[in-house]
């Protein structure tokens, strides 16, 4: 097994939707060097790998961000940070608009308004949501991608995470990655509690 040492400003562990979106946001707002490590391939990884038929987090006309917070709090039986949910909820529609600009097909009615489904959902043709995000990430100026690299542990010095260790699944390589910051985007925590 060969050893490869890498250095980056920001390491993102996980190349699903959240990891890709984080990389895009960082790339568009800074010149920081970003490295995504994904155990599969960012084109079809994460919980949206196969696509979806709706965006289930959108503030539809007549609703406000607090409504989404209330829904999520009830759904999680109160185990939430309301302040974080509110901050996220205030940006949901902005993220949706951005995904549409990247090429995601969002269904619209005859007046050009998004077709909604319920109180917080939009109908989409989302089978290509991950390939669309992957393409945008691949074109980002300061983002490098390591597909098929499984991160196995954090690199820690003096109680501070300063990188990670990974194994190339297909290339027999052990990666030692130094990073000034690490974002863990390895998946949601859904299903940790009893459904209500």
Task: Describe each PLM feature range.
Residues 2, 32-33, 39-168, 173, ...:
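Conserved N-terminal/central alpha/beta ligand/cofactor-binding core
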Residues 5-8, 171-181:
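Core beta-strand elements of the Rossmann-like FAD/NAD(P) dinucleotide-binding domain
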Residues 9-36:
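N-terminal Rossmann-like FAD-binding beta1-loop-alpha1 element of flavoenzymes
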Residues 14, 179, 185-186:
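Short, well-ordered coil/turn residues at beta-beta hairpins
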Residues 20, 127, 176-177:
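Conserved structured core elements
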Residues 21, 25-26, 46-47, 182:
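Hydrophobic/aromatic ligand-binding patch that stacks against planar heteroaromatic rings
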Residues 194-196:
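Short, solvent-exposed loop/turn segments at secondary-structure boundaries
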